[in-house]
Amino acid sequence: MPINLTHHFLIAMPSLMDDTFSKSVVYMCEHSERGALGLVINKPSAMSMKALFEKVDLPLGREDLSATPVFQGGPVHTERGFVLHEALRSHSVVGPSDPSPSSPSSPLGEPGEPGSAQAAPSLSADEPDDSPLESSIYASTLTIPGGLEMTTSRDVLEALSTGAGPKRVLISLGYAAWAQGQLESEIAENSWLTVDADPAVIFDTPIEKRYDKALSLLGLESWMISPGAGHA
């Protein structure tokens, strides 16, 4: 039976040595028979959210996010922003939020080159989702079973610029992608551990502790794993 790693963490094994994925934790936004898409959640860039908003000519109306780094989400489309946030409900929105979305940015799923140089899958944020969650108020959003959403349209930034928007947010430039069967092969080759995702690791855990915290979800510590040790 095919595995579905949507709303899971991939935890890099020590054998994965490249700069992008070494000691990385990847939050899986979508996984299907066509491929997989995720965001690295523990590789901050040198850019702060405040600097990013200045770059796109928007103020940042959320002082709590001003010094938060923008993350290096993966090697595909590193010029584009991807906003991971709680699924929007009345309790997860700060301040007033305009329910009328602006025009969406380019959708996810355009062909790209992940770290392994294989083509990225054609995944779309606009495709139907089996989750019972209500639709996001934003124009281009992938609703992820497990209570999170990934938005690629500018309207989420506009909401944050007014002091509104999701309470908990991670913004990345770029994403990680795997072609059909590629991720399954990498797991079989012992490149990754997998575990159900816990949003607290993404939003409530210091960046430098996220790798160890994700491992702890499996009852492991970093000293307990080594190249070729097997995966959970």
Language-model features, listed with the residues they occupy:
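Short, low-complexity, intrinsically disordered N-terminal modules
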Residues: S105-L108, S122
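Residue-identity detector for glycine
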Residues: G95, G109-G115
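Short Gly/Ser/Thr- and charged-rich N-terminal loops/segments
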Residues: P104, E113, A117-Q118
